[in-house]
Amino acid sequence: MSKLTALIQELVEPLLTPMGYELVDLQYGREGGRYILRLFIDRPEGIGLDDCEQVSRVVSALLDEKDPIPHSYYLEVSSPGLERPLKKEADFNRFAGRKVKLRTFAPINGQRHFQGRLLGYQDGQVRMHLEEGWDLAIPLEQVATARLVFDLADDEED
């Protein structure tokens, strides 16, 4: 995470939490000649268009006041979607039992890509039951990316 995105996160999270929203992810970069700041928000009952509009208004006002971004940009606010990223320790426990894809920074047992059922987070490690039939514990600092995999069977259980 860059210094700028870390600063934006520090400004935005305390604003969203009392409103009942979780900042799932934040992306900032240049695309097609313009800068875009994307916020992905969630809450237990899900996200609708009204939520995105409300968060966009309050975040836009805050960023206009604090002015941490040195040039013009577009602000986009959306749901993380069905295959949301897992970033925080709490995410790995909240979605235990769900199907996930995980990529590590360095190979573990000769591979960097894993898919299976998330068992949770414990003692600094993400635990999962792999599709190959064995369990794996990966230190959180070795996880490059992790995200839910949409599985209709999981959705029907909820």
From Swiss-Prot:
<protein>
    <recommendedName>
        <fullName>Ribosome maturation factor RimP</fullName>
    </recommendedName>
</protein>
<keyword id="KW-0690">Ribosome biogenesis</keyword>
<dbReference type="Pfam" id="PF02576">
    <property type="entry name" value="RimP_N"/>
</dbReference>
<comment type="function">
    <text>Required for maturation of 30S ribosomal subunits.</text>
</comment>
<dbReference type="GO" id="GO:0000028">
    <property type="term" value="P:ribosomal small subunit assembly"/>
</dbReference>
<dbReference type="InterPro" id="IPR028989">
    <property type="entry name" value="RimP_N"/>
</dbReference>
<dbReference type="InterPro" id="IPR036847">
    <property type="entry name" value="RimP_C_sf"/>
</dbReference>
<dbReference type="Pfam" id="PF17384">
    <property type="entry name" value="DUF150_C"/>
</dbReference>
<dbReference type="InterPro" id="IPR003728">
    <property type="entry name" value="Ribosome_maturation_RimP"/>
</dbReference>
<dbReference type="GO" id="GO:0005829">
    <property type="term" value="C:cytosol"/>
</dbReference>
<keyword id="KW-0963">Cytoplasm</keyword>
<comment type="similarity">
    <text>Belongs to the RimP family.</text>
</comment>
<dbReference type="GO" id="GO:0006412">
    <property type="term" value="P:translation"/>
</dbReference>
<dbReference type="InterPro" id="IPR035956">
    <property type="entry name" value="RimP_N_sf"/>
</dbReference>
<dbReference type="InterPro" id="IPR028998">
    <property type="entry name" value="RimP_C"/>
</dbReference>
